[in-house]
């Protein structure tokens, strides 16, 4: 079930303050964050976030198609190695 519209999107305060500070200065440095649960706002467009995936920080460049999604959606936590080959034919 989606979040109520009267509450608005959730964004961690420290993340929003870092983006506002960079927008005021006019800089576009990488912002390191562990907040995968924060919603991407239109103010974030053009910034690069280093989102933690549990092991390392994955750089995520924000564009307009990402607005409304969560930061964690763009930093996968699991790597798929592929399925093991079935050797039933070779056992005969």
UniProtKB/Swiss-Prot annotation:
It comes from the Bacteria. Disulfide bonds: none annotated. One of its GO terms (cellular component) is cytoplasm. One of its GO terms (biological process) is ribosomal small subunit assembly. GO terms for molecular function: rRNA binding; structural constituent of ribosome. Keywords: Ribonucleoprotein, Ribosomal protein, RNA-binding, rRNA-binding. InterPro entries: Ribosomal_uS19, Ribosomal_uS19_bac-type, Ribosomal_uS19_CS, Ribosomal_uS19_SF. SUPFAM superfamilies: Ribosomal protein S19. Belongs to the universal ribosomal protein uS19 family. Protein S19 forms a complex with S13 that binds strongly to the 16S ribosomal RNA. This is Small ribosomal subunit protein uS19. The gene is rpsS.
């Amino acid at each position: 079930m989606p979040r109520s519209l009267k509450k608005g999107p959730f964004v961690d305060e420290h993340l929003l303050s870092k983006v506002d500070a960079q927008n005021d200065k006019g800089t576009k440095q990488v912002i390191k964050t562990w907040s995968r649960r924060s919603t991407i706002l239109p103010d974030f467009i053009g910034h690069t976030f280093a989102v933690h995936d549990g092991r390392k920080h994955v750089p995520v460049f924000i564009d307009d198609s990402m607005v409304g999604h969560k930061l964690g959606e763009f930093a996968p936590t699991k790597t798929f190695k592929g399925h093991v080959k079935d050797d039933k034919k070779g056992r005969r």
